């Protein structure tokens, strides 16, 4: 972590200028496979520390726009909400007499995410086209697996912030 701090201090002005000019290019994410409880494998895309910092800046920009639009019953990847909160809400519903629930998983959702559809949806609420282009660059930045970089024409790596 100390090394990245030194890197950012030394290159801060150049990085900020590249971001402002729209010339910032994220690095490909590093592919990591982790086992799933059902025996399958989940492929994660781990961004560089530098890109994580930039993704956090994008997240801070998007959260105030999108957070008010989400359902009160949505808990995943939400600020101030946890799996423990979701379990507590299920308990509350059970105590109120509810006996049915729905578990939903969209298979391969992150692997097949259509970039253009996502970007067009984002444009409905994000007026700054630079933010849209930054997100597009992340989506298209590629995945490095076993030292080989593969292009990403669809999908979004799980593991980053965006």
Where are the model-predicted features located?
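Glycine-/proline-rich flexible loop or hinge segments
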Residues: 1-2, 35-44, 71-73
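A common structural microfeature
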Residues: 12, 16, 29-31, 41-43
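Conserved pre-motif C helix in the palm subdomain of viral-like polymerases
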Residues: 41-70, 154-162
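Amphipathic alpha-helical blocks
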Residues: 3-25
């Amino acid at each position: 972590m100390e090394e990245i701090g030194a890197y950012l201090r030394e290159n801060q002005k150049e990085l900020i200028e590249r971001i402002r000019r729209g010339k910032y290019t994220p690095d490909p994410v590093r592919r990591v496979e982790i086992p799933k409880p059902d025996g399958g494998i989940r492929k994660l895309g781990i961004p560089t520390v530098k890109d994580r910092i930039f993704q956090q800046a994008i997240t801070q920009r998007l959260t105030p726009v999108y957070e008010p639009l989400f359902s009160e019953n949505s808990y995943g990847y939400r600020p101030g909400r946890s799996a423990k909160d979701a379990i507590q809400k299920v308990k509350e519903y059970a105590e109120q007499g509810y006996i049915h629930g729905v578990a939903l998983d969209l298979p391969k959702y992150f692997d097949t995410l259509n970039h253009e559809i996502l970007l067009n949806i984002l444009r409905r609420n994000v007026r700054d086209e630079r933010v849209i282009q930054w997100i597009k660059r992340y989506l298209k930045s590629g995945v490095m697996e076993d030292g080989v970089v593969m292009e990403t024409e669809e999908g979004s790596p799980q593991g980053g912030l965006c």
